Amino acid sequence: MSLCERAASGSALLWPRVLLFGDSITQFSFQQGGWGSLLADRLVRKCDVLNRGFSGYNTRWAKIILPRLIRKGPGMENPVAVTIFFGANDSSLKDENPKQHVPLDEYSANLRDMVQYLRSVDVPRERVILITPPPLCEAAWEKECVLKGCKLNRLNSVVGEYANACLQVARDCGTDVLDLWTLMQKDSQDFSSYLSDGLHLSPMGNEFLFLNLCPLLDKKVSSLPWLLPYWKDVEEAKPELSLLGDGDY
């Protein structure tokens, strides 16, 4: 039997998956220096980091599409970690942005429903990380709104209400949570440098999110092995002894 035939007849090498689910702040996270790309680099040869960010989406729409993204599967097909990062659009002011706005109570219910759905497809709460929306720099975002011909359609105080609701859902459901809204404003610091336009993350904001998310994510993936041996550990005379079967890790 050839080496190719032996490899084909053996077990498939499955990469554990970390799934990032959110709005534009997640969609843009794979740009250069983005928090998603930083995670992918940190977890290389341990996990595939999947970007499932949808610009402009809110929890009302997210709840509908989640079952299309994650379904019950055997073992390693289930994500080892899932981030749920919504609220920046839900917290839009109803009068100024009714399409994206989601009432606070519904926002909480949608987050709960998504956590419950994940549990139903064998992604337990211990694998889930909720992330609150970041604070809003109203002065910078108002300039963006004016350029688009509309009024200021978000307020930081309102975003804070949604952040608090996200925290409460995490407490109720027993998931981890990253309180980005509070951390970026800690000790009344100027958080504007964390944002590129008052709403989305700047390079500094991406790094801030990455550094604060890592401790939560490490609890879920630190025990995972490096996939396939280090090159110096590959058997020189018969590399298949290292690269097939039990030599995967």
Curated annotation (Swiss-Prot):
What enzyme class is recorded for this protein?
Answer: hydrolase
The biological process GO terms on file are: gene expression; lipid catabolic process
Q: What GO MF annotations does this protein's record show? A: hydrolase activity, acting on ester bonds; identical protein binding
Provide the alphabetized UniProt keywords.
Hydrolase, Lipid degradation, Lipid metabolism
What residue range is the signal peptide? none
Q: Which residues form the active site?
A: 24, 197, 200
Q: What is its EC number?
A: 3.1.-.-
Do you know which InterPro entries this protein is assigned to?
A: GDSL, Iah1-like, SGNH_hydro_sf
Positions of the record's site feature: Transition state stabilizer: 56, 89
N6-succinyllysine modification, residue list: 63
Give the family per the record. Answer: Belongs to the 'GDSL' lipolytic enzyme family. IAH1 subfamily.
**Job of this protein:** Probable lipase.
Protein name as annotated: Isoamyl acetate-hydrolyzing esterase 1 homolog
GN (gene name): Iah1
